Amino acid sequence: QGSRISLTESGNLLLEHCERILEDYKRLEYEMHLLHNEYTGGLKLGASTTIAQYVLPPLLASFIGKFPQVSLSLLNGNSREIEAALQEHRIDLGFVEGVFRLPNIRYTTFLEDELVAVVRTGSKLAVGEEITPDELFHLPLVLRERGSGTLDVFERALQQHNIKLSSLQVLMYLGSTESIKLFLEHTDCLGIVSVRSITRELYSGQLRVVEI
């Protein structure tokens, strides 16, 4: 097709069967090792940004301590990028936030998390300890980017109150929770983040939670 190269229908069918054979071989190899209590090989993981930064590191360190012969790699991206990597067989297992989106992927709940609204301590933003959903219309926000599980969950929560994301005053969409926290240090706006990501900031008093 012009300057593009693409597989024919037969080629796609062959590729699909080759991928299945490869997966079956990897599974057989894994199960054969288990028969001899051997844990070797490679495990390619993928995780959305918040999970990769705040949840997995201690778990991966513990895993490596127990299974030193297993080679681990971790791909970091937003939830949709990780789902795409899983579909393309670039990773063996993915960890994502948010809602179950794709019917051809099997999702299993890993842990529960909570999104919270936060401002920097001492912010000039006129918010107390609690606001109503309708007050969000009048507050400047900084949010995660499109494709992130954090934004998906927040948008679904808004829909439960008949609020459209497009009707809010979003100053910035940023690609990581760390970026949001740094942004909040220098601006008077409200951020929506995972509560797991702000443990240190809450302890040090840099940020405070605003209940919605």
Please describe what each predicted stretch is:
Residues 1-5, 12, 35, 42, ...:
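A short, glycine- and basic residue-enriched loop/turn
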Residues 6-37:
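Alpha-helical "hinge/linker" immediately C-terminal to small N-terminal DNA-binding modules
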Residues 8-11, 45, 85-87, 136, ...:
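Hydrophobic residues within well-ordered alpha-helices
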Residues 36-103:
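Central regulatory/effector-binding core of bacterial HTH transcription factors
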Residues 70-77, 165-176:
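Short beta-strand-to-loop elements that line the ligand-binding cleft
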Residues 102-142, 146:
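Flexible hinge/capping segments at coil-to-helix
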Residues 103-109, 113, 175-212:
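Beta-alpha-beta core module
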Residues 141-162, 195:
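Secondary-structure junction motif
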